[in-house]
């Protein structure tokens, strides 16, 4: 599973960053 923040930073930048971080 690739980093969601890099996969779709526009779909949920805040959510992706929270999951990634």
Curated annotation (Swiss-Prot):
GO terms under biological process: defense response to bacterium; defense response to fungus; innate immune response; killing of cells of another organism
One GO location term (cellular component): nucleus
Organism of derivation: Ictalurus punctatus (Channel catfish)
Keyword Phosphoprotein in annotation: yes
Native organism taxonomy: Eukaryota, Metazoa, Chordata, Craniata, Vertebrata
Subcellular localization(s) per the UniProt record: Nucleus; Chromosome
Post-translational modification (record): Monoubiquitination at the C-terminal Lys gives a specific tag for epigenetic transcriptional activation and is also prerequisite for histone H3 'Lys-4' and 'Lys-79' methylation. Phosphorylated during apoptosis; which facilitates apoptotic chromatin condensation.
Assigned keywords, A-Z: Acetylation, Antibiotic, Antimicrobial, Chromosome, DNA-binding, Fungicide, Isopeptide bond, Nucleosome core, Nucleus, Phosphoprotein, Ubl conjugation
Crosslinked residue numbers (Glycyl lysine isopeptide (Lys-Gly) (interchain with G-Cter in ubiquitin)): 19
Protein name listed in UniProt: Histone H2B 1
